[in-house]
């Protein structure tokens, strides 16, 4: 039954515990997810803790609130503006402007908590979203209408890789793009806003932020706000949506903070007992329907590089493609630091990408896996002790590792190089040529930070 926003509730604050506030109502009490306002601070009802008392998550600083402060609310929950008016804007989780411009002109407002599409309305699209990044397109192709995770610890290049994916895909994406920043640095938000303006793609993009200085309730709910806007463009406008999230782990982290403040008993490694439920409530809304598709690319911080961490493990289970970033490769300067053996995708099948792509990807993985097995022997005895066959494997593997590096547009100014966008056909041609050779004219350093193999020939001709 839809909420009746005309029903008003009045109560008083009876307890404040950090970001959690208890409010007592003399008569009827608001329902779960209802919006309560006290002293100018917005709060969302999280649970009913006793007769006439609700426990709320504060969505702003609780300074200035005190016992007995008057609180008001309705049956309505938090709503955000939807429509063409939000395009080209930088907003917070309520849809309020962060870009210094007037509030967006929206034709409607919708609640942020919505059910996922019903099973009968979902569709599977066996289509690949080409990114122009060799390592991803070859070994972990992104599903159009699917969910892709960029996994890695601190400092291995998740945000840079996500920025490059935005640069390469948003410009060629024919629908709407939506960026959701959860618990990351405010500096990165400003940089991304400026870069999107310089690239000329801001007018077809919405940017929502709940950054690390915000209350845990904001960081926990901003993802739902972003999905409500994305669902409008998918369902009402029948457009494809590209949803980029940085960082989905911060959503889990905010949920853990909120859970602790609500007094719930923590589960394994200190995470909230409702981790799986909360993550599913967000991820299941990211889906393809008969009217349109939401393609999601999510950066995932992995605490202490531990991929068995419950948060990382639960996020893995929702994804159609996992791009794993390796600290070892990053330390060797092999950027993007995509781990070719750990990264996976359900799209990497002959039926979807074609037999040739599938065979080349398998050949690349097999060669790199053999090289990994030989590393210890090389370290102890030297490469001279290997057989001719094994030396050829090492030569191919080391050139493949360097060929899969790539200069990025988004760090071109800092690195002093021009970015390269490589079509998948040229990536396949280059890998196939390297795999077929047993001896090489050029040193392995020549393959480092190039685009296609044709770039080598152009340099040689010049």
Swiss-Prot record:
Function: Produces ATP from ADP in the presence of a proton gradient across the membrane. The catalytic sites are hosted primarily by the beta subunits.
E.C. number(s) listed in UniProt: 7.1.2.2
Keyword flag Cell membrane: yes
Matches recorded under HAMAP family: ATP_synth_beta_bact
Matching InterPro entries: AAA+_ATPase, ATP-synt_VA_C, ATP_synth_F1_bsu, ATPase_a/bsu_AS, ATPase_alpha/beta_chains, ATPase_F1/V1/A1_a/bsu_N, ATPase_F1/V1/A1_a/bsu_N_sf, ATPase_F1/V1/A1_a/bsu_nucl-bd
UniProt keywords, alphabetically: ATP synthesis, ATP-binding, Cell inner membrane, Cell membrane, CF(1), Hydrogen ion transport, Ion transport, Membrane, Nucleotide-binding, Translocase, Transport
Enzymatic reactions: ATP + H2O + 4 H(+)(in) = ADP + phosphate + 5 H(+)(out)
Organism of derivation: Dinoroseobacter shibae (strain DSM 16493 / NCIMB 14021 / DFL 12)
Superkingdom assignment: Bacteria
GO cellular component: plasma membrane; proton-transporting ATP synthase complex
CDD domains (UniProt xref): ATP-synt_F1_beta_C, ATP-synt_F1_beta_N, F1-ATPase_beta_CD
Enzyme class, broadest EC rank: translocase
The name this protein goes by in its record: ATP synthase subunit beta 1
NCBIfam families, per database record: atpD (TIGR01039)
Summary of subunit composition and partner proteins: F-type ATPases have 2 components, CF(1) - the catalytic core - and CF(0) - the membrane proton channel. CF(1) has five subunits: alpha(3), beta(3), gamma(1), delta(1), epsilon(1). CF(0) has four main subunits: a(1), b(1), b'(1) and c(9-12).
Family assignment from sequence similarity: Belongs to the ATPase alpha/beta chains family.
Membrane topology, record value: Peripheral membrane protein
Compartment(s) of residence: Cell inner membrane
Primary site of residence: membrane
Single Gene Ontology MF annotation: proton-transporting ATP synthase activity, rotational mechanism
Chain sites annotated for binding ATP: 152-159
Pfam families to which the protein is assigned, alphabetical: ATP-synt_ab, ATP-synt_ab_N, ATP-synt_VA_C
Entry-linked SMART domains: AAA
């Amino acid at each position: 039954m839809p909420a009746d926003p005309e029903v008003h509730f009045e109560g008083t604050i009876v307890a404040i515990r950090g970001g959690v506030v208890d409010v007592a109502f003399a008569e009827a009490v608001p329902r779960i997810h209802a919006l309560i306002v006290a002293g100018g601070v917005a709060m969302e009802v999280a649970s009913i803790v006793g007769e006439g008392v609700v426990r709320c998550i504060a969505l702003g600083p609780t300074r200035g609130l005190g016992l007995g402060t008057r609180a008001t609310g309705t049956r309505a929950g938090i709503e955000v503006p939807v429509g063409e008016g939000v395009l080209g804007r930088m907003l917070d989780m309520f849809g309020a402007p962060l870009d210094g411009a007037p509030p967006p002109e929206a034709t409607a407002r919708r609640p942020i908590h919505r059910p996922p599409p019903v099973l009968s309305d979902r569709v599977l699209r066996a289509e690949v979203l080409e990114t122009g990044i060799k390592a991803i397109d070859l070994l972990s192709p992104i599903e159009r209408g699917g969910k892709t995770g960029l996994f890695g610890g601190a400092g291995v290049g998740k945000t840079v890789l996500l920025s490059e994916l935005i640069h390469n895909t948003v410009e060629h994406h024919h629908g709407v793009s939506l960026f959701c920043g959860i618990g990351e640095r405010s500096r990165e938000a400003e940089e991304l806003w400026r870069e999107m303006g310089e690239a000329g793609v801001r007018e077809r993009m919405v940017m929502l932020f709940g950054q690390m200085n915000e209350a845990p309730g904001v960081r926990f709910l901003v993802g739902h706000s972003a999905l409500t806007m994305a669902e409008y463009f998918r369902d009402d406008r029948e457009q494809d949506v590209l949803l980029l999230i940085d960082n989905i782990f911060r959503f889990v982290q905010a949920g853990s903070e909120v859970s602790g403040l609500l007094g719930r008993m923590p589960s394994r490694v200190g995470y909230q007992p409702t981790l799986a439920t909360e993550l599913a409530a967000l991820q299941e809304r990211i889906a393809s329907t008969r009217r349109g598709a939401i393609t999601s690319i999510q950066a995932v911080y992995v605490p202490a590089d531990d991929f068995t961490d419950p948060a990382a493990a639960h996020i893995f289970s929702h994804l159609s493609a996992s791009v794993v970033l390796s600290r070892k490769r990053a330390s060797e300067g092999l950027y993007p630091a995509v781990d070719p053996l750990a990264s996976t995708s359900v799209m990497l099948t002959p039926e979807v990408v074609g037999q040739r792509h599938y065979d080349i990807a398998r050949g690349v993985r097999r060669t790199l896996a053999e090289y990994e097995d030989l590393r210890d022997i090389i370290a102890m005895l030297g490469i001279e002790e290997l057989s001719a066959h094994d030396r050829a494997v090492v030569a191919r593997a080391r050139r493949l590792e360097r060929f899969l590096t790539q200069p990025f547009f988004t760090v071109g100014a800092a690195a002093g190089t021009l970015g390269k966008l490589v079509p998948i056909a040229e990536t396949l041609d280059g890998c196939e040529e390297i795999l077929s050779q047993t001896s090489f004219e050029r040193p392995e350093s020549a393959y480092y930070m190039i685009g296609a193999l044709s770039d080598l020939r152009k340099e040689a001709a010049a």
